């Protein structure tokens, strides 16, 4: 019976939340509103609570004055060694008092991961929530053909050998699950009448004291509904996220994409097996539906040399390196500067380091490629490609701007290193040579 008392507490708290939901009706009409559903006077029902489904241990009735009265079911003391739990019933029964099989109520069963579950049956789902904590577990229930799953936070255990119980995914200490449902009277919770003349909430003499009740209830994010309720992590147990699985489709207050769970309003880039993360497509979880759209990059940028960054779909304008002193015309001490790009690729134990210079005359990009294995230069060559082709190479990053004179110094030193590093290990020589391309600020701003 572990967890049933907690579920009933959730129901009573939810009834209190429902008390704030009222509608103007005529005096001649008397009915009860509960979970956005109308009930006639005298009508009885079991409340519904995700992810547990119908709570058979709580009975609700619509009274003559329009109040919703919910009470816990009082289970009798059984005088048998092995009581049996019956679906659709709160209290267990002794085997000799079970009804015949042909009188069993027929309800829709549920299908989940190749297993069929009967209405009211609880089970554990592994791998449903990817971001669950070590003290959390996924508990599901079957209710009228729908599978309701929730992430439940388990209480801290104070024993060395916890045991499993049939009605909860959380393990408990032996004896903790044997909760007593023996009460002198049923606990009753009232909801104000749904009439034009409003009634304030009246506590029944059977209701538990406020201090006792508040201590065992989770804090809800809002008072409109229990859907999407966020449970305090310090509470003993509770549901953080609900997922409703109807047939083979998942829906509820979350979206599931590529094995990951996203809450309403959360955005992400889809991860396709053949392409990896698609940076230029953005998906957003809209209650239960994934809405994906293509990101359109601007045709013009406020800077002359926008930069492609890893993890970004569109190019961005880089911040100008603070150590350089360019004037408004993109020159350094009267000499024109050109952008320098760099890329480092590692594959099969080889490192390819590329340094590229973009020139206006001629309009091309000169790429110097170094292929290094175990610190020794294996291959060196120079490529000249068009700006259009270079624009499609997203692994290059803008590192600085340099002048043609500095680039010539770099090329001369590069020729010397290509001979020297082909026969011995060169670890810092190329890195030191690249520093030649960085322009130093002249003293007192004089060239």
From Swiss-Prot:
One of its GO terms (biological process) is negative regulation of BMP signaling pathway. The keyword Metal-binding does not apply. Its main location: secreted. It holds the Pfam family CHRDL_1_2_C. Residues 199-219 are annotated as: Disordered. Residues 1-22 form the signal peptide. GO terms for molecular function: BMP binding; transforming growth factor beta binding. Keywords: Developmental protein, Differentiation, Glycoprotein, Neurogenesis, Osteogenesis, Repeat, Secreted, Signal. PROSITE patterns: VWFC_1 (PS01208), VWFC_2 (PS50184). SMART domains: VWC. Glycans are attached at residues 113, 286. A motif (Cell attachment site) lies at residues 174-176. The keyword Secreted applies. InterPro entries: CHRDL1/2, CHRDL_1/2_C, VWF_dom. PANTHER family: CHORDIN-LIKE PROTEIN 1 (PTHR46303:SF2), VWFC DOMAIN-CONTAINING PROTEIN (PTHR46303). This is Chordin-like protein 1.
